[in-house]
């Protein structure tokens, strides 16, 4: 499988796992009767997503050196920032977006190495 596609899949699964963990944390605001059931559902989805991401990560490490693959995983910062704004209405400051832009520039530089 193409290394870039594999990296994108790892990033997406990791992002999904993070969003599910956030959702599980927010379930504690629910009435106590529903809290545990909802939390466990979101945590189960998070574990599955993160577990699949880890398996694909191991496959990716067979194709790329760790010194190249790991910095490119920083794409997660971009995905999680965008998802947090979209799904949770979280606001990012200009400084945050400049940091995201710097990360994207770094990923671009790393991808030329491949």
Swiss-Prot record:
SUPFAM superfamilies: Multidrug resistance efflux transporter EmrE (SSF103481). Disulfide bonds: none annotated. Its main location: membrane. Residues 43-112 form the EamA domain. Pathway: Bacterial outer membrane biogenesis; lipopolysaccharide biosynthesis. Belongs to the ArnE family. This is Probable 4-amino-4-deoxy-L-arabinose-phosphoundecaprenol flippase subunit ArnE.
């Amino acid at each position: 499988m193409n290394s870039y596609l594999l990296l994108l899949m790892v990033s997406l699964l990791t992002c999904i796992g993070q969003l599910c963990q956030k959702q599980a944390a927010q379930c504690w605001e629910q009435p106590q009767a529903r809290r545990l059931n909802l939390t466990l559902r979101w945590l189960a989805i998070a574990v599955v997503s993160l577990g699949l991401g880890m398996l694909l990560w191991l496959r990716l490490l067979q194709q790329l050196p760790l010194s190249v693959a790991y910095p490119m995983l920083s794409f997660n910062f971009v995905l999680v920032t965008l998802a947090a704004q979209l799904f949770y209405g979280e606001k990012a400051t200009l400084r945050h977006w400049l940091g995201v832009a710097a990360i994207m520039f770094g990923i671009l530089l790393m991808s030329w190495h491949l």
